[in-house]
Amino acid sequence: MEVALAHPALKAFMCGSLSGTCSTLLFQPLDLVKTRLQTLQNNMHPGAPKVGMITVLFNVIRTEKLLGLWKGVSPSFMRCIPGVGIYFSTFYSLKQHYFQEGSPSAGEAVLLGAGARCVAGVAMLPFTVIKTRFESGRYNYISVAGALKSVCQNEGPKALYSGLTATLLRDAPFSGIYVMFYSQAKKALPQEISSSSIAPLVNFGCGVVAGILASLATQPADVIKTHMQVSPALYPKTSDAMRHVYVKHGLSGFFRGAVPRSLRRTLMAAMAWTVYEQLMARMGLKS
């Protein structure tokens, strides 16, 4: 009863948080493999054979057991559950305020998605930093609270916002591009499909296509963000991380970890949007 009486933006927050919980739990291993691939670059000697996604995956299972693939899931939950909720509630509020009478155009969809992601990204960045460090395997943090305390004591609170520029350069365009492709793909669907029982499956397919395109476009920013958050002392500025990656690995270094990241971001976004839209429909709200 209390849920039914809640403000629509709060309902959007709850639907988003639940969808974020499901997608984070399922796809955390891909995020861990992506982080390990990107941070492995710094330990590789020139001419050393390239390490692929499958090699990293089996190495983690061998040295850290199967559950090692979910290392960093606690900060991921602390970031994604409220973070996805904030994103969808902000998205819903902006859409209702500016586009109540009709659907946004392709350009407006980019701004809508990017704006909502900026709000969520800034709010949850400290947990993004901790999550990245957990996954890198370089830090012996026991808990999220302990990690936050350690960073504040040893590096200062400013370190919790390391990689802010790179994070926003990665997440805002990803969300904007994703929302644009996703909304345009759904618009192109025949009405009989949109209102049929297979609509969730079709929407998921639209989300997968949108996610792949958005992931590839923002991969370089993700590599830079990871370097800055794992080693903030070495790369205090975005330009420092960019220079290091380019000098040591060339242009291909900016696409290290692209496969696991694209898989994870694409599947997470597609699932989150599909679950969110179904939950919102159950509550009688248009997402």
From Swiss-Prot:
Catalysis: reaction(s): glycine(in) = glycine(out)
Q: In which tissues is it expressed?
A: At 24 hours post-fertilization, expressed predominantly in posterior blood island, posterior cardinal vein and circulating blood. At 34 hours post-fertilization, becomes restricted to posterior blood island and circulating blood.
Q: Does the keyword Cell wall biogenesis/degradation apply?
A: no
KO phenotype (gene knockout): Fishes lacking both slc25a38a and slc25a38b display anemia.
Which Pfam family, giving just one, matches this sequence? Answer: Mito_carr
**Membrane protein topology class:** Multi-pass membrane protein
Which Gene3D superfamilies does the UniProt entry name for this protein? Mitochondrial carrier domain
In the record, biological process GO terms are: erythrocyte differentiation; glycine import into mitochondrion; hemoglobin biosynthetic process; hemoglobin metabolic process
PANTHER family, A to Z? MITOCHONDRIAL GLYCINE TRANSPORTER, MITOCHONDRIAL GLYCINE TRANSPORTER B
Record family assignment = Belongs to the mitochondrial carrier (TC 2.A.29) family. SLC25A38 subfamily.
In UniProt terms, what function does this protein have?
Mitochondrial glycine transporter that imports glycine into the mitochondrial matrix. Plays an important role in providing glycine for the first enzymatic step in heme biosynthesis, the condensation of glycine with succinyl-CoA to produce 5-aminolevulinate (ALA) in the mitochondrial matrix. Required during erythropoiesis.
What's the name of the protein? Mitochondrial glycine transporter B
**What organism does the UniProt record list as the source?**
Danio rerio (Zebrafish)
Q: Which gene encodes it?
A: slc25a38b
